[in-house]
Curated annotation (Swiss-Prot):
Cross-referenced Gene3D superfamilies: Ribonuclease H-like superfamily/Ribonuclease H (3.30.420.10)
Subunit structure: Homodimer.
Binding site for Mg(2+) 2: D24, E26, H182, D187
Record text on cofactor binding: Binds two Mg(2+) per subunit. The active form of the enzyme binds two Mg(2+) ions in its active site. The first Mg(2+) forms only one salt bridge with the protein.
Lineage of source species: Bacteria, Pseudomonadati, Pseudomonadota, Gammaproteobacteria, Pasteurellales
Protein known as: Ribonuclease T
SMART domains: EXOIII
HAMAP family according to UniProt: RNase_T
GO CC annotation: cytosol
Origin superkingdom: Bacteria
Enzyme Commission number(s): 3.1.13.-
Length: 218
């Protein structure tokens, strides 16, 4: 009987049925429970015809502070967000989060994945703000794993010896415009490029898969 060999050029096989979704948030503070979520971006990934990870679908929202949210002026100065600017086009959390979920579930279906996993730079921060917003709006059908994540700061420290996003991108030869940093969409795009670069570099070096399916079952 011929043994089936896992094809890791399919995304569903590369991450054990998980769909990596790269996210970034901009906030009005550091406390996910009390401080406002102001901006959210998310990008899904897919495999190209050669089994290399590439960016796929994206969404981006400016978000209205939830009722009673804390707004730290120092945080606004840091990220350059003017929450009173009518041109922001901000939407409530109960619009942004479900729309992101729709995109993620659509990508999961296309890639044959059973669940999504958050990828972010210093991922515990972004995951905490997303989870807090999900809880506030009582969102249903959350596609994300409740605690698993891929932290690109940790991965970049391992791969390149750099944990700061701009430094890691430079090491990976990814162009980075510091003037656009702290825009959720730009940071998500660069984090996506970095994550793909690290996964693809490991493939090129022969570091994945480590053993054949037959060897792994011995």
């Amino acid at each position: 009987m011929t043994e089936q060999v896992t094809d890791y050029n399919f995304l569903k096989n590369r991450f054990r049925g998980y769909l990596p979704v790269i996210i970034d948030v901009e906030t009005a503070g550091l406390n996910a429970q009390t401080d406002a979520l102001l901006e959210l971006a998310a990008i899904t990934v897919k495999m190209d015809e050669n089994g290399y990870l590439v960016p796929d679908q994206k969404c981006h929202f400016h978000i209205q502070p939830f009722e009673g949210a804390n707004i730290n002026p120092d945080s606004l100065k840091f990220n350059g967000i003017d929450i009173d600017n009518p041109l922001r086009g901000a939407v409530p959390e109960n619009i942004a989060i479900p729309e992101m979920f729709k995109m993620v579930r659509r990508a999961m279906k296309e890639q044959g994945c059973q669940r999504a996993v958050i990828v972010a730079h210093n991922a515990t921060f972004d995951q905490a703000f997303v989870q807090a917003a999900v809880k506030r709006i009582n969102a249903k059908r959350d596609p994300f794993h409740p605690f698993a994540m891929f932290d690109t700061a940790t991965l970049a420290g391992f791969m390149y010896g750099q944990t700061v996003l701009v430094k890691a991108c430079q090491m990976a030869k990814i162009p980075f415009d510091g003037k656009q940093a702290h825009s959720a969409l730009y940071d998500t795009e660069k984090t996506t490029e970095l994550f793909c670069a690290m996964v693809n570099r490991l493939k090129d070096l022969g570091g994945f898969p480590l053993v054949s399916d037959s060897e792994s079952n011995v």
